[in-house]
């Protein structure tokens, strides 16, 4: 029987086949006529891609049926290798939450009066409750940079 194969260019070629022929055989005949290797050929009939091991009868391809030939697409981009790191990831520092931590800034004296142990920053932009750091020779505000230096008694 005779079937037609329509190529991408619109050219139609005729092939002499039997209904018992496999799709592999049909692709080999197309290679003889067109020079396209069978591994690059995809044959479509009635919207379905024809698989190599099956016969024309499996797909109900009869005389004077038209198959559509499309070329197989090349694969996608080259697969990238997963990056391997030599050093382990640095563990992020976790701040410890200490309950009642504010108690270290205050002291209750013998009379029951609450005293501040640290000096509060007088600058308006820092706001109330901003304590200055106690250094051996000065008080320092980390927020605004205000510094008070202790007077040294008995200048040497």
UniProtKB/Swiss-Prot annotation:
SMART domains on file? Ribosomal_S27, UBQ
Q: Which UniProt keywords apply?
A: Cytoplasm, Isopeptide bond, Metal-binding, Nucleus, Ribonucleoprotein, Ribosomal protein, Ubl conjugation, Zinc, Zinc-finger
GO biological process entries: modification-dependent protein catabolic process; protein ubiquitination; translation
Cysteine disulfide partners in this protein: none
The reply to whether rRNA-binding figures as a keyword in the UniProt entry is: no
Cited Gene3D superfamilies: 6.20.50.150, Phosphatidylinositol 3-kinase Catalytic Subunit, Chain A, domain 1
Pfam families on file: Ribosomal_S27 (PF01599), ubiquitin (PF00240)
In which family does this protein belong, per the annotation? In the N-terminal section; belongs to the ubiquitin family.
Q: What is this protein called?
A: Ubiquitin-ribosomal protein eS31 fusion protein
The major lineage groups are: Eukaryota, Viridiplantae, Streptophyta, Embryophyta, Tracheophyta
